[in-house]
Design a protein with these regions (language model features):
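Polytopic alpha-helical membrane proteins, predominantly small-molecule transporters/carriers
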Residues: 1-343
Length: 343
């Protein structure tokens, strides 16, 4: 029962993340770089900090979390910086492929590589932990099934690209460009997988038994997102200067509206990793699902992003065969979430 609760919590977080680009559409008269960094303040700084505070028991301070973990803190933030590159290209992948296809390819690559890279790199720096032992047959099977589901959705995307006229493509996704979007999405997925590597290096940054299991991942999440914010802020401020868009922040007419929707987008985005931490607290009896939890989250993100893609009519004009292939891919991804537990 606890495993089902854990998976349900992760699924709710995935649904929220897949919805985070909906409020962004309500932002008015701001350039991409302006709203991206502002929503990042909420998604990558404020909310993760508040989440990390939940891991601090009464009588202790926030900074005590990091005592004796200097190397782990540095590595966690470093992979956060690398993940930030993935976050930037992630947004571009959706620009050229749409929410459904862009998230599908990027998150699929992220799910597979993120799950495997964590134990591999952890084993290099801390061989005594024997992190590779976590990559069991069940875990690899879960990753493979997830990638199969992603590949099927990718086929649906390719079918969509070849069947629609240029006018129909632009109507669904304004800047649709499948080859360019595919390359960017694969890069985004590889770099985004660094998030889970960061979590692996920061998995011991908590107060042990004094921190409830469901909050133990939150300090590492905060460090990763701080690293990611640094990357994104540098790029966005560069774009503000290049495009002369610093005035966006002074536009009082849209300030309250845009801050509201940036905060909402940030909260929805952060929900996935808050939910991941809470969900893992219910999965402690299953080492396989603990290792696969990040992959499961990414798979469910893909499922819900495609649901949003259908709602937002990004698949409008596609044949029934294309939609059928898409649905098969979604079903395979749903199966990948619980299949390893049955093996």
């Amino acid at each position: 029962m606890e495993i089902l609760i854990g998976l349900l919590i992760i699924a709710i977080g995935a649904f929220c993340q897949s919805s985070c680009y909906v409020p962004i559409n309500k932002i008015k008269d701001w350039s991409w770089e302006s709203y991206w960094v502002v929503q990042g303040v909420f998604a990558w700084l404020i909310l993760p900090f508040l989440g990390a505070m939940l891991a601090v028991p009464s009588g202790h301070s926030f900074f005590e979390l990091f005592d004796g973990y200097g190397f782990n803190v540095a590595m966690t933030m470093l992979f956060g910086v690398l993940w930030g590159v993935g976050g930037l290209t992630f947004g571009l992948s959706m620009r050229y492929l749409g929410v459904a296809l862009g998230q599908s390819i990027a998150l699929g690559t992220c799910a597979g590589l993120g799950t495997i890279m964590g134990p591999v790199l952890l084993n290099i720096f801390f061989p005594e932990m024997d992190a590779l032992s976590s990559l069991t047959f069940s875990v690899i099977l879960g990753v493979v099934v997830t990638l199969i589901g992603i590949a099927i959705i990718g086929v649906a995307g390719s079918m969509k690209a070849s069947s629609l006229s240029e006018e129909e493509k632009k109507a669904a996704v304004k800047d649709f460009n499948f080859p360019k979007g595919l390359a960017i999405a694969l890069l985004a997925g590889f770099m985004s997988g660094c998030f889970n590597v960061g979590l692996a290096f920061g998995e011991d940054i908590h107060f042990g038994t004094f921190t409830p299991d469901m909050f133990k991942t939150l300090p590492a999440t905060f460090l990763v997102t701080v690293g990611g914010f640094i990357t994104n802020a540098i790029y966005c401020f560069y774009q503000n200067t290049k495009n002369h868009t610093w005035s966006d922040y002074k536009n009082e007419e849209v300030w309250s509206n845009n801050i509201l929707y940036c905060a909402l987008a940030g909260a929805l985005w952060y929900s996935q990793f808050f939910g991941l931490s809470l969900g893992k607290g219910f999965l402690t009896e299953s080492p396989t699902l603990m290792t696969l939890s990040f992959c499961i989250l990414m798979a469910l993100n893909v499922v819900f992003s495609n649901v949003w893609g259908i709602i937002l009519k990004e698949w409008k004009g596609c044949s029934k065969k294309t939609i059928g292939v898409l649905i098969v891919g979604i079903i395979v991804l749903i199966i990948s979430s619980f299949l390893p537990q049955l093996v």
